[in-house]
Structures are given as structure tokens and as C-alpha cells.
From Swiss-Prot:
Entry-annotated residues carrying N-acetylserine: 2
EC number, UniProt record: 5.2.1.8
Name of the protein this chain belongs to: Peptidyl-prolyl cis-trans isomerase
Note from the entry: Present with 9490 molecules/cell in log phase SD medium.
Length: 411
């Protein structure tokens, strides 16, 4: 019986002369009965010892046997003809036949019942001799078993519901529910975007709007330039016509050539100015920063105790956070692969006393020196985070990255 795993406690109270099924139909689980105990309170004044019997349906019994087996039509016809011939003789022996027939029918019914059910005595208990008896009886749901007690005392059976290798698997629905719960509790997806993603999308939208404005201004400037060019050409043609109408004094060829060259130079100068203006417009209102300026504005990294790396993104105002100060923080915590495992971006800020061991050691070291309004990235090696300890969403030996902002401080 070592393969039968106990699942729950089993108990059954069998009152005298009342058959009780061993297994309830609502719980079709194999039971193992290990003890039978006598109830010392008698139901009558006879005080007879109680005998526990087990009644089991015969697995080899079939309804066809109960009904008389298979029938053959030819045999039925022959029997009917024989019955007609013997009908007269049966009438003569009517009085004697009825009595014998009733006795034979009762005997047949008793025999049929005996064939259908098997009854065995398990034990007999008495308050004068023996109160209890140990058993080792295993009953499966497929067996139709009942208990009955004869005597003056009830008998209580106890044992365990057990897991039998041939039982129908239980808890299929529960397993499906557990799978659904795992799906909903799993952290393979994140419905809320990171703040960095939101800020990046907003900046992209602003860049797109600026590009559209620049393009619109370029188109307008080009239209204005075309209109200006057409107006200048019309003015030049009118001036030339006027000059042709007016009587001019005779000029030398050198003077005409010089004037023509001056006009050409003026046209070229105008075109150069327009091209330069358009070029500046395309480049934007500010000149591109040099590498030195870009490096100057790039956040500088510092390596602190235990290899903790900090990058100040925004320098706050006021005094710096020191040991013992109560600080309120906003933060986003990420694993090395960028997956967010925890964050506080709204509601009540996360507050703790700096340097008092209320948070992981990496925070006590990394937050020190910040001012209110300051933003910082803290990269914490595993020994200064949770080390070998695995938490929900955080594997063991994980390097953690926190983007933090100091929103309040009280010394």
C-alpha cells in the first residue's frame, strides 16, 4: 500500500440495521479503512454485541442472468405448445401447484439475490470484550460496497482518502485555472510604457512638428523668392523700355559693357544671398554643437563603492541628501535586459531614511548626494542589490538599474 498517497481523513458512522455505502457518489475517491471502533451507547436494552458486515456487489453478476439468460424463439414456441398440452393436468393439481409454486419462487428470488450480492463478516465488537479493531481495507469507487451493523451498538470506521493509480484524475478544472492564473501573473508583457518611452515619443512628435514648420517656411520662402524674382524681372524690363524711349546721349562701348557687368554682379549677389538664407533655414535656428559641447552636456558617470555606477541626468536645488535624512523618491527599476520589474511614478512617493539599512545597500550609497529635483541613474551590482536571493520578477544574481528622482527631503 506504499503507492497509495493519503489525501484526506475518511470517517463513516454505521448505525445498526441501516446499510451505508462505503463511498459517497459526490466524492468518487479510493478509501483506505484502518480502524473500526464501537460506540459505547446502546440503542436498546438488549446490549447485544455488534457485528459489522460488508456487502459487495458481485462483479460477475449480469442482468441477463437475473432475467434468465438469452432467449431463443424456437424454444419459446416449443415451450408454449408443451404448456398447452400440460394445461389440463395443471388444472387438476391447481391447489397443490399454487403452494409449491410460491415456495419455489421465493427460493429462486433468494438465490438470485445471493448471486447478485456477496456478504461477509468483518468483525464483532462488544463493550465487555473489545472496543476497537485495526483494519487494512481498500475500496475503490468502481466497487459497489455497503456496510451494515447488526447488534445494539453503532460502529465508526476511520481511515484516509488515498490517491490510487487507477483513479480518474481529479482536479482537471483546477489545473486549468492554475494555468490561467500563471498566464495572468506572468511578467512576459508590460501594458504600461516606460517613462523613457513616453518622453521619447513626445520628443519625436515635437521634432516632427518642427520639421513640418521648417518645410512650410521653406515653401513660403521659395514662393516669395519666385514672386520677388518675377517682380524684379518686370521692373528691369520696364526700366529698359524707359531707357530705350528716352533719348540717351551716345555712350562708348566700354561704359555699356561696364554697366552690363554691374547688373550681372548685382543679380549674382542677390542669388547668393537667397541661397545662403535658405541654407541657414534648413539647418535650423541654432548651429550644430561641436563635439566638445556635446561631451560637456553628456551625463558623467561615477563609480562608487562596490562598483555602483551613478549618472546625474539633472542636478537638483538645495542641500544634498545625507545619512539620516528622510527622502521621498520616484523610480523605475529595470533588469539588465531592460525589463521593468518595479516602479513608483505616481501616487505617494517611496520614502525611507537614507543610510539606515531600510533599503538595499545600493540605494543607500547611490542616492546619497542628490538634491531635491535631481534625477540620477544608479546601476547596482548583484552583491549590493539582492545577491543570490531570487524575488518575483528578479532572478538571483541580477544587476539592477534604477532611474530615480528625489522629490522630497527632510533632514
Amino acid at each position: 500500500m506504499s503507492d497509495l498517497l493519503p489525501l484526506a481523513t475518511y470517517s463513516l458512522n454505521v448505525e445498526p440495521y441501516t446499510p451505508v455505502p462505503a463511498i459517497d457518489v459526490t466524492m468518487p475517491i479510493t478509501v483506505r479503512i484502518t480502524m473500526a471502533a464501537l460506540n459505547p451507547e446502546a440503542i436498546d436494552e438488549e446490549n447485544k454485541p455488534s457485528t459489522l458486515r460488508i456487502i459487495k456487489r458481485n462483479p460477475d453478476f449480469e442482468d441477463d442472468d437475473f432475467l434468465g439468460g438469452d432467449f431463443d424463439e424456437d424454444e419459446i414456441d416449443e415451450e408454449s405448445s408443451e404448456e398447452e398440452e400440460e394445461e389440463k393436468t395443471q388444472k387438476k393439481k391447481k391447489s397443490k401447484g399454487k403452494k409449491a409454486e410460491s415456495e419455489s419462487e421465493d427460493d429462486e428470488e433468494d438465490d438470485d439475490e445471493d448471486d447478485e450480492f456477496q456478504e461477509s463478516v468483518l468483525l464483532t465488537l462488544s463493550p465487555e470484550a473489545q472496543y476497537q479493531q485495526s483494519l487494512d481495507l481498500t475500496i475503490t469507487p468502481e466497487e459497489e460496497v455497503q456496510f451494515i451493523v447488526t447488534g445494539s451498538y453503532a460502529i465508526s470506521l476511520s481511515g484516509n482518502y488515498v490517491k490510487h493509480p487507477f483513479d480518474t484524475p481529479m482536479g482537471v478544472e483546477g489545473e486549468d485555472e492554475d494555468e490561467d492564473a500563471d498566464i495572468y501573473d506572468s511578467e512576459d508583457y508590460d501594458l504600461t510604457p516606460d517613462e523613457d518611452e513616453i518622453i521619447g515619443d513626445d520628443m519625436d512628435d515635437l521634432d516632427d512638428e518642427e520639421e513640418e514648420e521648417v518645410r512650410i517656411e521653406e515653401v513660403q520662402e521659395e514662393d516669395e523668392e519666385d514672386n520677388d524674382g518675377e517682380e524684379e524681372q518686370e521692373e528691369e524690363e520696364e526700366e529698359e523700355q524707359k531707357e530705350e524711349v528716352k533719348p540717351e546721349p551716345k555712350k562708348s562701348k566700354k561704359e555699356k559693357k561696364r554697366k552690363h557687368e554691374e547688373k550681372e554682379e548685382e543679380k549674382k549677389a542677390k542669388k547668393v544671398k537667397k541661397v545662403e538664407f535658405k541654407k541657414d533655414l534648413e539647418e535650423g535656428p541654432t548651429k550644430p554643437k561641436s563635439k566638445k559641447e556635446q561631451d560637456k552636456h553628456k551625463p558623467k558617470s561615477k563609480v562608487l563603492e562596490g562598483g555602483i555606477v551613478i549618472e546625474d541626468r539633472t542636478i537638483g536645488d538645495g542641500p544634498q541628501a545625507k545619512r539620516g535624512a528622510r527622502v521621498g523618491m520616484r523610480y523605475i527599476g529595470k533588469l539588465k535586459n531592460g525589463k521593468v520589474f518595479d516602479k513608483n511614478t505616481s501616487g505617494k512617493p517611496f520614502a525611507f531614511k537614507l543610510g539606515r539599512g531600510e533599503v538595499i545597500k545600493g540605494w543607500d550609497i547611490g542616492v546619497a548626494g542628490m538634491s531635491v529635483g535631481g534625477e540620477r541613474r544608479i546601476i547596482i551590482p548583484a552583491p549590493y542589490a539582492y545577491g543570490k536571493q531570487a524575488l518575483p520578477g528578479i532572478p538571483a544574481n541580477s544587476e539592477l538599474t534604477f532611474d530615480v528622482k528625489l522629490v522630497s527631503m527632510k533632514n
